[in-house]
Amino acid sequence: MRTFSDDIGWGDLWVKRPHNSTPTPWLDSLRDKGKRHGLRNGVTHNFAVGSVGGLPFEEITFAQVLQDSGYYTAMIGKWHLGHNGSYSPVHRGFDYYYGIPYSNDMGCTDKPGLDLPTCPPCMHGQYTAGKHEQCYSKVALPLFENETIVEQPLDTWSLKERYAAAAVKQIKTSVSRKQPFLLYVALAHMHVPLFHNPFFNVTTQAPYTASLSDMDSLVGTIMEAVSTEQLENTLIWFTGDNGPWEQKCQFSGNVGPFVGRWQTSRGGGSAKRTTWEGGHRVPTVVAWPKKIKPNSTSNALLSGMDIFPTILSLAGVKPPSDRRYDGMDITDILLNDSNSGHKSIMHPNSGAAGQFGDLQTVRLKHHKAFYITGGSEACGGGSGQQHYHQPPLIFDLSQDEAEEAPLNPDSDEYRFVLREVVKESAALLLDIATDKVSTANYRTDPAAVPCCQNPICRCHSLK
């Protein structure tokens, strides 16, 4: 079972913070049962409400591989890899899908959640540009079951309960079918607009804190279902996609000590959309009874790309041999306390300075080289001037986790690290040039916008 949180901060969980004592008992118990990691994540682009394409068909998902190997596969939540036609999750390896096809801020609702700026509710008549100009889309946010829109606009304030019920139902379905199962839960938490159980005491809990507690409760419901069905041989992998969206101010999470001070002291953000540590270091825990040592921690350098080969390895399933894989199998790290992670990881631009896909940062063990900085908005505005660094800024994270003071370019340490960075980058570019590379179609078309009933896009068929 893989659970994916959206826009969660590294400092939101499992660290001592004097100003926030958010109770997350279920995630704490998962931590105590498993092994903690920090994963580095990032994408180069995502898909729009009107996208005609999605994840290229040449690419294979781990759900497809497991499905072909006899697993019952279900997905709950955010897909965001294409919703039009054959790009739907049910055509990409999942037997069942229930969720929002993209981010929960990419459409209006009748009862908007908490966001900055505040977005208006959907209008039943003619939309006016002025009311929606600062929001992503005036099209109502859809809720899908498989390929059918069952509610539009969906009620986000009851989404947690519906996601929990759907997840529990799919676990029971796998038991009744006597199949091993893959359950992928891609949460709307902690992405804006925030929503939470109305019974949480928001007079003592800030909205973000209440939403975090809400997320913990959802994870707990799923964990209880696994226990109730006596599925002891179930691996649970909790992680996030990227750091908090700091321009959302009080509605965003905490980066912990990874503040990207070099950038913030010059204006601009250092969290989501950036390759500063706060932008792509996320809390991660993997638990598997009697297999993974409880309450343990790994400092190995890992990536979200490692999930694909590792899940298949743990399931005893081999991936297709006609391609290369960017991630590494971390089974030895999970089961045998190895700390042999990646030597280097390349981080492309994912929405801040530079062009999508530009090589922005290279991580080499505990050093990190920045070729591009700036371009991401901070709380209160200001994105910092875009800079191309040649030679790059290099930080030693073992001594400077806040990324405040780059190494002196004239130092022996800098020159040694730079040589290694150049060597690793060249090897990656050669690997890309000699491998099969797919190209996504980012074209948009109004006809591809999810709409259950033209032209108003409004329906409710939930029972």
Provide a role label for each language-model segment:
Residues 1-392, 403-423, 427-434, 440-463:
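Formylglycine-dependent sulfatase
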Residues 400:
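Acidic carboxylate motifs that coordinate Ca2+ or other divalent cations, activating on Asp/Glu
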